[in-house]
Amino acid sequence: MAFELPNLPYATDALEPHIDKQTMEIHHDKHHNTYVTKLNSAVEGTDLESKSIEEIVANLDSVPEDIQTAVRNNGGGHLNHSLFWELLTPNSEEKGTVVDKIKEQWGSLDEFKKEFADKAAARFGSGWAWLVVNNGQLEIVTTPNQDNPLTEGKTPILGLDVWEHAYYLKYQNKRPDYISAFWNVVNWEKVDELYNATK
């Protein structure tokens, strides 16, 4: 079965002023859609068509060599963005088991946000910043391009796209401003759900 572009769980202008409508439209309808199209083209006629995108990305080493790069880039792009849309909401509320765990590990939510923001800002070129669960502990990691922590056996529960296409229309070269705005639209309920599913 072909992979499909998921619908956004909110209107394209729902995250204004933090993430603008035009960026959301281009990011979802054009960029994400292209990843889906190219992923389907790469896996057509292979047994990967019947697997979930999570399973494929978690086992990239077993993907045939001739399509591995295309699947890594476009499969990662599809998985990362599918998760990203769900991790955003116009009704952000900082609560839940995961928030308590963050405070326990970092001392405060602000300390966590600072480390996450620093790592996201320092990610050279295109990539992602993630909060992952690794052996029961929370960890902040970054990945290049469309790589996903699942490939390294870590479970992502929060992710931030730091490709320029995610913010350039509104923030231009001011990536730290975009990262700061991100905290206003984090769907902590979804982060909590993903965290609890790892237990």
From Swiss-Prot:
- Cofactor(s) needed for function: Mn(2+); Fe(3+)
Residues reported in the UniProt entry to bind Fe(3+): 27, 81, 161, 165
* Co-factor: note: Binds 1 Mn(2+) or Fe(3+) ion per subunit.
Molecular function (GO) terms for this protein are: metal ion binding; superoxide dismutase activity
Q: Which reaction does it catalyse?
A: 2 superoxide + 2 H(+) = H2O2 + O2
Give the matching InterPro entries: Mn/Fe_SOD, Mn/Fe_SOD_BS, Mn/Fe_SOD_C, Mn/Fe_SOD_N, Mn/Fe_SOD_N_sf, SOD_C_sf
What EC designation does it have? Answer: 1.15.1.1
Provide the binding site for Mn(2+). 27, 81, 161, 165
Q: Does the keyword Iron apply?
A: yes
UniProt entry keywords in alphabetical sequence: Iron, Manganese, Metal-binding, Oxidoreductase, Stress response
The record's top EC class is oxidoreductase
Query: Which function does this protein serve?
Result: Destroys superoxide anion radicals which are normally produced within the cells and which are toxic to biological systems. Catalyzes the dismutation of superoxide anion radicals into O2 and H2O2 by successive reduction and oxidation of the transition metal ion at the active site.
Question: Which family does the UniProt entry place this protein in?
Answer: Belongs to the iron/manganese superoxide dismutase family.
- What this protein is called in its record is Superoxide dismutase [Mn/Fe]
What is the source species? Staphylococcus haemolyticus (strain JCSC1435)
